[in-house]
């Protein structure tokens, strides 16, 4: 399949990108490789520079040497030496404490020098790759020395990483403090899930294809499942995870972003606020949870010992920096409803967790059965036909599962998949998931970034769960083995409604092997699926 593009995308605006926390993994693993990819695509301006700011004792020379040593570890394909030298010549470093006013003056001097050398036209792009507890402090210090001003055609934008607070109150306070220095249009709250092609394609899939949108409602859809599963444990993040847990870490940002893009009404345009208005409507339409709802429709879990790829792995309570009697959840499953005409009485089931059977993120749309089962006497292995799955990671694409007649002399039904695969149809991507987000920030397009009201609405939706779980500490942790799909209570959550979680991986394998399994039913000359 050939990709088509009506017009070439414009080159990103000239700017100095300032990375706070530049010595951390995010810079090496994601940001620099993403910038390299943008340069290779012709989307990064020649008038560009990077200034790293961190506490680590380095200077520009040693920072460049560190990146030079690390780049081969995190860039998926070899980097052209000339291209990499182009970057190194534009990378600078300022050492300092985020609380030290003198460090910000040194930073300002370095920014002005880089601007003069590389002609970045006074445009500034601050990336705060630090804990949210530093967001307000850093923005305040930048404001005090004039590094947040927009004047004479110059722009300044600030990207902040999740989490955006730790509850509704802290999110509201953070937004208030940021807006004392910045306008909403200057604040870009990043969610790297939205940098994935399939997530961006979800709106195109829904609103550019006339055969899809008419089916996208309560009349035809039985329920929706959203899964964000990780096969790894908390690794070196035990200290952070003890203060957060799976609910706060994943639901108000990643999972709610996927939910809103799935459920939103068509926007009047693809301008940033037009899209985000519709996403915010969904968050505000989430049915408020009572304490009884939380007990019935919210499941928490914590992983115990188990195996991952044949290797024994420890329980969460035995991870570094985790309390031996910790009640922090590493798994969450929720049943939510949206109170509007399109989705009334259609449940949305969300689940996320650590040390699960497979690393996968997907949205599964289960369509309703036909009103009259014409082929009800015909054996079929799995009655849950007509399921669409939007695969987000690790393999991006869309598949639609439906019933078809197995070739042969008798009426036998089998399940087949109609697949769109990004790697197969467009070629393998080397994207880190940050390219589009960095480019959009340079261009001032906030469509894929959360707005303040969306952040607060997300926290408000899970506030009842936070309160109930705080009042009623979990019992029986750990309650699922590493390498499983989570606690039994998550299965029960759907079983009570006569439904079940999608058998991720198994269904795809079934589709591949079903032809072989039915070989004896086919006559000569028939085709396999």
Residue ranges and their predicted role:
Residues 1-160, 164-529:
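Secretory/organelle targeting and membrane-embedding segments
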């Amino acid at each position: 399949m050939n990709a088509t593009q009506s017009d070439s995308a414009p080159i990103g605006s000239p700017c100095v990108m300032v990375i706070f926390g530049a010595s951390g993994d995010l810079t090496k693993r994601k940001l620099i490789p993403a910038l390299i990819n943008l340069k290779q695509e012709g989307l990064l301006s020649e008038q560009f520079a990077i200034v790293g700011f961190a506490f680590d004792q380095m200077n520009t020379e040693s920072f460049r040497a560190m990146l030079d040593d690390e780049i081969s570890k995190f860039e998926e394909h070899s980097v052209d030496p000339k291209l990499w030298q182009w970057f190194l010549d534009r990378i600078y470093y300022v050492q300092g404490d985020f609380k030290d006013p003198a460090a910000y003056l040194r930073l300002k001097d370095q920014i002005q020098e880089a601007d003069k050398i590389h002609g970045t036209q006074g445009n500034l792009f601050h990336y705060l790759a630090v804990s949210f507890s530093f967001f307000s402090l850093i923005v305040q210090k930048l404001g005090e020395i004039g590094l947040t001003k927009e004047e004479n055609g110059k722009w300044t934008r600030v990207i902040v990483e999740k989490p955006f607070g730790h509850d509704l109150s802290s999110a509201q306070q953070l937004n208030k403090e940021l807006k004392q220095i910045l306008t909403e249009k200057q604040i870009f709250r990043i969610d790297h899930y939205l940098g994935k092609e399939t997530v961006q394609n979800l709106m195109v899939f829904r609103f550019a294809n006339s055969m899809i949108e008419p089916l996208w409602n309560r009349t035809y859809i039985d329920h929706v499942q959203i899964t964000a599963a990780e096969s790894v444990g908390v690794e070196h993040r035990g200290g952070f995870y003890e203060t957060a847990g799976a609910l706060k870490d994943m639901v108000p940002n990643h999972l709610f972003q996927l939910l809103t893009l799935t459920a939103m009404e068509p926007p009047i345009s693809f301008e940033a606020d037009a899209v985000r208005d519709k996403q915010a409507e969904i968050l505000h339409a989430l049915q408020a949870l009572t304490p009884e709802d939380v007990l019935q429709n919210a499941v928490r879990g914590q992983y115990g010992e188990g195996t991952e790829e044949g290797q024994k792995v420890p329980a969460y309570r035995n991870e570094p920096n985790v309390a031996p009697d910790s009640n922090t959840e590493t798994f969450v499953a929720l049943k939510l409803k949206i109170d509007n005409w399109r989705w009334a009485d259609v449940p949305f089931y969300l689940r996320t967790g650590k040390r699960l059977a497979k690393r996968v993120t997907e949205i599964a749309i289960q369509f309703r059965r036909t009103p009259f089962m014409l082929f009800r006497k015909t054996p079929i292995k799995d009655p849950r036909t007509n399921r669409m799955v939007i695969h987000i990671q690790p393999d991006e694409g869309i598949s639609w599962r439906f019933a078809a007649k197995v070739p042969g002399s008798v009426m036998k039904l089998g399940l087949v998949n109609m697949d769109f695969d990004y790697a197969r149809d467009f070629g393998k991507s080397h994207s880190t998931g940050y390219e589009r987000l960095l480019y959009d920030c340079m261009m001032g397009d906030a469509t894929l970034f959360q707005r303040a009201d969306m952040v607060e609405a997300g926290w408000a939706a899970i506030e009842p769960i936070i309160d109930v779980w705080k009042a009623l500490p979990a019992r029986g942790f750990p309650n699922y083995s590493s390498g499983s799909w989570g606690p039994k209570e998550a299965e029960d959550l759907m079983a009570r409604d006569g439904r079940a979680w999608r058998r991720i991986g198994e269904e795809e394998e079934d589709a591949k092997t079903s032809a072989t399994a039915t070989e004896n039913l086919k006559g000569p000359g028939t085709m396999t699926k």
